[in-house]
Every structure is written in structure tokens, then in C-alpha cells.
Amino acid sequence: MKPPFLLALVVCSVVSTNLKMVSKRNSVDGCIDWSVDLKTYMALAGEPVRVKCALFYSYIRTNYSTAQSTGLRLMWYKNKGDLEEPIIFSEVRMSKEEDSIWFHSAEAQDSGFYTCVLRNSTYCMKVSMSLTVAENESGLCYNSRIRYLEKSEVTKRKEISCPDMDDFKKSDQEPDVVWYKECKPKMWRSIIIQKGNALLIQEVQEEDGGNYTCELKYEGKLVRRTTELKVTALLTDKPPKPLFPMENQPSVIDVQLGKPLNIPCKAFFGFSGESGPMIYWMKGEKFIEELAGHIREGEIRLLKEHLGEKEVELALIFDSVVEADLANYTCHVENRNGRKHASVLLRKKDLIYKIELAGGLGAIFLLLVLLVVIYKCYNIELMLFYRQHFGADETNDDNKEYDAYLSYTKVDQDTLDCDNPEEEQFALEVLPDVLEKHYGYKLFIPERDLIPSGTYMEDLTRYVEQSRRLIIVLTPDYILRRGWSIFELESRLHNMLVSGEIKVILIECTELKGKVNCQEVESLKRSIKLLSLIKWKGSKSSKLNSKFWKHLVYEMPIKKKEMLPRCHVLDSAEQGLFGELQPIPSIAMTSTSATLVSSQADLPEFHPSDSMQIRHCCRGYKHEIPATTLPVPSLGNHHTYCNLPLTLLNGQLPLNNTLKDTQEFHRNSSLLPLSSKELSFTSDIW
């Protein structure tokens, strides 16, 4: 009988020892330790704060006075690592008052844990409190780390109290509290009422969320406490809703074996308090964790959130799909109100689908490439076709007379060697001929159409303003003589180019590098706002279906094609150097019924055998001609000209000719035939 009794005694001893160890698990050196209290104290630097010993408010049923009367002493320590150091109160910045520590002006270094110990020779109990002191954030009246948090459902009633106000009350009066929202005074709505030290919102709206700061004065210092109010939707009474896959509508996904796969499950969760969304995948009755290692769940992703309502996603990930993975997978979503689920069926993809997809995408890609190539090669032709059939006439109601103003250089063949006669003929003959005769445009050519009515500059400015385009034929001679100077000297013309009031078409007749100062050309291009550059390539551009003429017509105004009568442009005997293109003379033509007494033999400078038979004339001006100078005899079909060189319109005198008396020059040559030298004895820029 003794062995069983001894065994029972040993067991009782062990149990008793274990019970004693459990009862002393939270005690150190015989002192009961309640660890850290849930309440945290927070203050801004420079503000007063009171840290109260939590033993008298949450752990023992007695107050400080009663405990002191029974011989218990209250001592304070500050935790520094694993050590607790006694606090020496300076009475200046920090003092002890009954069951509390008063920080009269808290500093950031005061942050930490403070332990109050209540003990005598036979009894000991302690607890720690947390204090956080922080500086204001830049531009704010609070620090986001030391805000209090309150929540309220939308449309509900909410009261926001000013924390720790009891610590700053005086026995005879309530503290005067001022409320701010986002650190600014606010005109509260009628349903928001300040009730004592609290702010009462009778019906919370979404816009009521934010930071509320209460402010009061204590011992000459400001005390601020900030509370963040989070507004949420009404507490839901419904289970979550699957968004993909859809509930009661299984989705079928065709997969290719050996390829990775990612299947998302999306669901909507109404606001259900502090509980987070619960979402997971299953294969039949097994959780994903129970399946093979190549199948796993991803992380829960928050897609959207509004007032606590969330849309989340959980992906089912296959590193490489195998035959055994072709099955039904279910996504489950839960909250405290219930559970919903939706399914996905994996099915093997036939190879024909891939071939069809590749063929379709390839055909679309080839079609896009073909369209791009066609556009790159025929973009101008396409635009001209569109303009011809659908474009509006640009010349309607714009109050402009001419389609383009032609600016070029006429070179004196006797005084300047011309390296490019083909370019000269193009600028003076071919270009106007084709634009007027073939395409029906109306050009203003100064040498032909200028009718003096004022000063030369005013006349040119007026005609440029009446033109829809400005065509500049850019030859080396044009650049050497700075043919564009007229557009820089006249302010109105310069403003038209700079502001884009008129579009400029710049035609380059040759490669300019190495022949002229290209910096001036580039400066000219930069000064023009609306500029199109077209290059004339000689014989390559001679045919009407060449890229040059199509590009030029594209840059010209949109208008219906109007063919001008040939008699207005060319003589029947005139032929050009370009075969298909017919030239017009460098000086516009006209004829007169008046004839001179002198015969052809009397005109030593008249050369009927020239390679190009060009009828020369100049515009008639208001010049009184005596009737006696027109005799009856006729010279036949010869043309007559006023001997008034067009260069004199600028007030210039012919080069290499010195006139002693300009008036005598005009008086003695009022009506004489002009020789070819007189017609080209200088370089005129128009």
C-alpha cells in the first residue's frame, strides 16, 4: 500500500509547484507586473501633458489617497532598454502630482515608457504607460503619428470629443475649446453642433471625414489634440459578391499544356467592420495548399476601396499546366453574413485555334503594313484625290484676288554668267505656264501684272496681301541678291511671314551647298511660320505627273480647276526646253495696235533669229504721249514697247549706264522699241 501513497504524494507536489509557477508568471522579484497599459499618451512638443498611473484606474479598486493612507508608496521609473531608472523630478519642466507626472513643456526626448510602482514591504504592483512627443508636420497643426482615431458610418450620428480634457479642467470652470478642421477655422453646417468640449455631427456625410483639432489654453500654453474621423459605408448585412468568375455561371478557359496560367478571382465586399476580406480557391474538396507544388495562390490585391467597401482579387497561379490540372476550380468568398462561390473549368485548347489566331493577326499586320506603305508612297496623291472630291473651295469668300504671288530673280545675261539657264527658264516661263494654263491658278507676276498706284513697296505689299500663297523660287542668284530683302524691309510683309498669315512655298532649283551662304537660307526658313519646301530636279520634274508638280498643287489653295485660254499665256510659236511643258516669256505679253514709222531694219537691236521668239513688253503707265509720235505707216506684226525699264520702278538706274539727265532720258525715249539688252540689262528681283 505504501508505494501508491508515495506516488500520489509526489504527483500532488509537482502539480502544486506548477500552479505556483503559473501564478507568478507576470511577477518579477515578487512584484506583480501588468506590462504596458492600453492607453497611450500623445502630445506635441512644447505642450503640457499629464501621464497618470493606470493602476488606480484599471487594475485596483482604490484611489491614490486610500493607498497612501494604508502605507503604500508610489514611485516612478523611466524604461531605458531593459533597465528602469528612477525619475528625479526637477519641478521646473517635470513634476509629480499625486498619481500623475506633469510635463509642463514636453520635448521629443521625453518619449518612451514610464512605469509606476505601488508597494510596501509586503505588497508590490506596477504597470507601464506609453508617451509619444512629436513635432508639428510642416504646414500642419498636428503630427500624423499622434492622432486619435474615430470611425462613423455614413448618415449616422457621431460625437467627437476632445481627448484628455479632464486633465486641464479647473474646478470652477470648463476649458474654452476651439475646433478646427484640417487646421483651418470652419463654418460648420447646421447639423454640426459644438456641445461643451465635443463636436456633435447629427448626420455624418462622406465629406465629414478628415482631421479635427481641438485647441485650448492651459497655463498660458496651447494644448492641441487631433482626431482623425474615418467615414465608412453602412454596415452590410449581405455576403460578398463574386465578380469574376460569375456566380452560378461557370467560366470555361481553354489552356495550352505546358504553358503558365494565371486565373484571377475578383469579388466585392461590403463594409463589415474590422474584419478583412476572406477569399480563397479550392479544387473540389481540397484547398490549394493540398495540391501539387506547381499550383499556388497569389497575394490578395486590393483593387478599389470606398468608404470601407472593397474590391479585391486573388489569383490562382499555375507554373506549367499539366493534363491533371484540367478540372473545375472554385473561388470562395466569405464574411460574417455568409459565403458565395464561383467556378472555373479548365479545358485543353486545340491547336487549330492558335493557327487561326496567328493567321488572323498576320493578315491584319500585313494589311496595316500595306496601308502604311501605300500612304508613305502616295500620301500626296491620296490627299489630292480627297481634296478634288470632298474638299471645300478655299477661294470662296476670302476676298483675295490671286492664288499665289511669284517671287523670283531675272538675271542679266550680258553682265552675269548664268550657270543654270534651265533653272532660269523654269522660274520665268515653265512654272507660271503650268500653274496658270494646266491647273487654272491665277498668279500675280510683278513683272507682268504690277499696276503702279503708289510707291513700289506699297504696291507689292498690297498684291502680296491679295494673294493666298507666296511662291519663292530659290536660285543661287536669288540668294546672292537677297531677293527676300523686300519681305524684311516692309514691316507688313515681314509680319505676314512671321505670324503665318500667308503660307510660303519655297522651291529650291538646285543644290545650294557650296554655292551660296546656306546660313542665310536657314535663317529665312526659320523666320517663316508656315513654310513648305519643294525641290525642282530639272528634267526629272518636267513631266506633269512627277512628284514635284503633285506636291506643288497640294500646297496651293484648294479650288476648282479652271483652264485659262492659251492666248492669255503663250504665243503659238513659243516652245520650251522641257518638251511637255510650254513656257511663257519672262516679261508678260501684250500687243498694241499702234505701230512705229521705223521698219525692222531700223531696229539694230532686234534679233528675229533668237532661239526663243519672245514678245517683250512692259506695263503701260500714266505717261502722256504726243499724238504726233504715232504715224500712220505700220511695221507689220512687230510689237511695240514703252521704253520704261521696270527696274526704274524701284528708283534704280541701269547697271553700267550713266544718265546725266534722268528727265531727258524719259523725254527722249517715251515710245521706242526696247532692245534685248535693255530688257535684261540688270537683275530684277520680284
UniProtKB/Swiss-Prot annotation:
* Annotated keywords: Disulfide bond, Glycoprotein, Hydrolase, Immunoglobulin domain, Membrane, NAD, Receptor, Repeat, Signal, Transmembrane, Transmembrane helix
Q: Which Pfam families match?
A: I-set (PF07679), Ig_2 (PF13895), TIR (PF01582)
**Known EC number:** 3.2.2.6
Q: Which residues form the Ig-like C2-type domain?
A: 18-132, 141-232, 239-347
Range of residues in the leader sequence = 1-16
* Classification via InterPro entries: Ig-like_dom, Ig-like_dom_sf, Ig-like_fold, Ig_I-set, Ig_sub, IL-1_rcpt_fam, IL-1_rcpt_II-typ, TIR_dom
Q: Name one GO biological process term.
A: central nervous system development
Residue ranges annotated for the TIR domain, each copy included: 400-556
Q: Which GO terms describe its molecular function?
A: interleukin-1 receptor activity; interleukin-1, type II, blocking receptor activity; NAD+ nucleosidase activity, cyclic ADP-ribose generating
Q: Where in the cell is it found?
A: Membrane
Cystine crosslinks: C53-C116, C162-C214, C265-C331
- Topological domain (Cytoplasmic) residues are 376-686
Annotated glycosylation sites = N63, N120, N136, N211, N328
Catalytic activity field: NAD(+) + H2O = ADP-D-ribose + nicotinamide + H(+)
For the Extracellular compartment, the record's topological domain ranges are: 17-354
Instruction: State what protein this is by name.
Output: X-linked interleukin-1 receptor accessory protein-like 2
Q: Which organism is it from?
A: Homo sapiens
